């Protein structure tokens, strides 16, 4: 089956076309991206601007045509935190559907976390044992822990690299004092979340997904993307600390000259590095293995599974009083309760 996955993220809109069937390795056929920076496209009231909405609609329409011309039997389109948190998200979604015919599904943060965990589990396999996964997006940080394909704990926190750059590091380069303040604040924000994640059990393997982690690993010496997805890549907390000391003194334009970081992500890589470091510190992780699969692959795998066994593509989650999304019962559902 040829599938198209359209991902409206905080930084980019990405269309991935794959050939996939249940039990098989999804084979990428094409990849098309557009940088829209939706995480920065809101006005003072928290609504997506008309200009940004216009660009989003035209991009989705263009990508939908690419999916059709590529022979996709189905286009799965989803959006994450930038659209999810916008005050006018319903209006934007309605406009996308009306003008392009694409039904854009907004994923909850914990669904992002759970679907990404599924992709990680399939990539590393059962022999990896208990896995903790970390994923840094433009608007949120996802954490998960489990021994099955459904994590026992899945969290989504509003600690994305783009969000924190805007709120904490507006200067270029960021001042040393602001970096130190953000570091301390992250330690406080992650204290309760780390306890929740670790209550499920100590990991046998710590994994990281997302472009932010891949860029950080490359900046600390990991293999380039040209080496292929199966090249082993890792990121250490010591290497991360040294990297932060280096890149936090550079301007965004200078950081963009470094191998492994794009012009689009250069402004927010310092905040991303600080989130990565704080997360690893909070979870007592020294090294994370980088997984090339993440949310898009997880959605493809869940789609194939749901068609075979009749389960829902995504399930409901709860939001706690601190604004973080948390799911502590996913593994129990996967073991028998599929309602």
UniProtKB/Swiss-Prot annotation:
Question: Which is a Pfam family this sequence falls into?
Answer: Ppx-GppA
Q: Which InterPro entries match?
A: ATPase_NBD, GppA/Ppx_hydrolase, Ppx_GppA_N
Location of region: Disordered: 315-339
Compositional bias per record (Basic and acidic residues), positions renumbered to this chain: 319-339
Q: Which reaction does it catalyse?
A: [phosphate](n) + H2O = [phosphate](n-1) + phosphate + H(+)
What Enzyme Commission number(s) does the record list for this chain?
A: 3.6.1.11
The Swiss-Prot or TrEMBL record annotates one GO molecular function as: exopolyphosphatase activity
The lineage's top-level taxon is Bacteria
Q: Per UniProt, which keywords does this protein have?
A: Hydrolase
Q: Which family does it belong to?
A: Belongs to the GppA/Ppx family.
Function, in words? Degradation of inorganic polyphosphates (polyP). Releases orthophosphate processively from the ends of the polyP chain.
**Quaternary state and partners of this protein?**
Homodimer.
The protein here is known as Exopolyphosphatase 1
């Amino acid at each position: 089956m040829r599938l198209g996955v359209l991902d409206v993220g905080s930084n980019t809109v990405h269309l991935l076309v794959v050939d996939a069937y249940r039990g098989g390795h999804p084979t990428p056929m094409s990849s098309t991206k557009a940088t829209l920076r939706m995480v920065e496209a809101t006005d003072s009231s928290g609504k997506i601007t008309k200009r940004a909405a216009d660009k989003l609609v035209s991009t989705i329409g263009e990508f939908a045509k690419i999916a059709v011309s590529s022979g996709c039997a189905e286009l799965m389109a989803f959006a994450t935190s930038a659209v999810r948190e916008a005050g006018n998200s319903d209006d934007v979604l309605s406009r996308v559907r009306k003008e392009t015919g694409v039904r854009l599904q907004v994923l909850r943060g914990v669904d992002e976390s759970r679907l990404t965990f599924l992709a990680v589990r399939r990539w590393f396999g059962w022999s990896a044992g208990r896995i903790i996964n970390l994923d840094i997006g433009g608007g949120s940080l996802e954490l998960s822990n489990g021994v099955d394909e459904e994590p026992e704990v899945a969290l989504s926190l509003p600690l994305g690299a783009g969000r924190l750059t805007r709120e904490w590091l507006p200067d270029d380069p960021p001042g040393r004092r602001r970096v130190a303040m953000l570091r301390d604040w992250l330690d406080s924000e992650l204290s309760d979340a780390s306890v929740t994640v670790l209550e499920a059990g100590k990991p046998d393997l710590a994994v990281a997904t997302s472009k932010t982690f891949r860029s950080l690993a490359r900046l600390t010496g990991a293999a380039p993307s040209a080496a292929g997805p199966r090249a082993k890549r890792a990121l250490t907390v010591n290497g991360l600390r040294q990297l932060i000391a280096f890149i936090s003194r550079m301007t965004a334009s200078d950081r963009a000259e470094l191998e492994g970081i794009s012009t689009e992500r250069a402004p927010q890589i310092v905040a991303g590095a600080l989130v990565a470091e704080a997360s690893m510190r909070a979870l007592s992780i020294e090294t994370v293995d980088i997984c090339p699969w993440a949310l898009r692959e997880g959605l493809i795998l869940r789609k194939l599974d749901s068609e075979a066994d009749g389960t829902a593509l995504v399930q409901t989650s709860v939001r706690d009083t601190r604004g973080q999304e948390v799911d502590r019962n996913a593994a129990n559902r996967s073991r028998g309760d599929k309602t």
